Design a protein with these regions (language model features):
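Anionic group-transfer/hydrolysis microenvironments
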Residues: 46, 100, 131
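Active-site diphosphate/adenylate-binding microenvironment
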Residues: 2-78, 83
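Conserved small/polar residues in nucleotide/adenosyl-binding loops
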Residues: 126-132
Length: 136
């Protein structure tokens, strides 16, 4: 337990929260600070979401929903709507890149039509793209 506590402390100390461009570590720290413990998180495929699986604290079972085994870009927003319907008392956070967010037009109209409220965070991958990060 102490080792886990030390990891969390070091993770928060190393988060980049004061840079002009919001870095993923800073985003994750800010979200950790505000997320209720009963939150559910949906992720898209991509760099941000690979990082997110290690960066969030999960307090309840069935609180992380991700397509990482299938690489489904555009999964997060639609999954968030389904999670919110299944768990109406949970605060649902959906994280995705700008490409995944661009695939959510029909789901946006569904959310508005049925008054399904989730928190959606779309990150611009101008300099964080997976292909760029994998280049040597």
């Amino acid at each position: 337990m102490r080792e886990k506590s030390n990891y969390y402390k070091k993770r928060d100390e190393n988060a980049h929260v004061n840079s002009k461009i919001i870095q993923p570590s800073g985003l994750f720290k800010e979200l950790r600070d505000i997320m209720p413990k009963n939150s559910s998180i949906t992720l898209d495929a991509g760099t941000l979401c690979l990082q997110a699986t290690d960066e969030f604290n999960f307090y309840e079972p069935k609180s992380l929903f991700t397509p990482l085994d299938f690489g489904l870009v555009g999964f997060s927003f639609a999954a968030g709507l389904g999670v919110k319907l299944a768990k109406p008392n949970s605060t649902v956070f959906s994280l995705m890149g700008d490409g995944g967010f661009g695939m959510t037009v029909s789901e946006l109209s569904t959310a508005v039509h049925h008054n399904i409220n989730t928190i959606t965070i779309a990150v611009s991958y101008t300099h964080l793209t997976l292909p760029t990060n994998r280049e040597v």
